[in-house]
């Protein structure tokens, strides 16, 4: 870098500008995806329903699937309300 370009400033090349923009977009999408509910949860809930209903009669409302974020971990929580065996 020359002394003159230090004061005037260099014009960034379009490739480096595009790369910076892409990095910002990717970081934004990744952070947004973590905050929202994963898109596989409804399918997971239906598949659990299909497997469990082979053995026990339950309704779809009896299965709750949730993802919680704790620090750097994602916890998948599955709650299944089984009918009384009486």
From Swiss-Prot:
Keywords: Cell cycle, Cell division. NCBIfam families: minE, PRK00296.1, PRK13989.1. Prevents the cell division inhibition by proteins MinC and MinD at internal division sites while permitting inhibition at polar sites. This ensures cell division at the proper site by restricting the formation of a division septum at the midpoint of the long axis of the cell. This is Cell division topological specificity factor. Belongs to the MinE family. One of its GO terms (biological process) is cell division. It holds the Pfam family MinE. Gene3D superfamilies: Cell division topological specificity factor MinE. Disulfide bonds: none annotated. It comes from Albidiferax ferrireducens (strain ATCC BAA-621 / DSM 15236 / T118) (Rhodoferax ferrireducens). It comes from the Bacteria. InterPro entries: MinE, MinE_sf.
């Amino acid at each position: 870098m020359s002394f003159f370009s230090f004061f005037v400033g260099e014009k960034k090349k379009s490739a480096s500008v595009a790369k910076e923009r892409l990095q910002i977009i990717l970081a934004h999408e990744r952070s947004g995806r973590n905050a929202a509910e994963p898109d596989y949860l409804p399918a997971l809930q239906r598949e659990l329903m299909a497997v469990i209903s082979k053995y026990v009669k339950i309704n779809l409302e009896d299965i709750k699937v949730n993802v919680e974020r704790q620090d750097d971990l994602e916890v998948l929580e599955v709650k299944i309300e089984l009918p009384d065996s009486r």
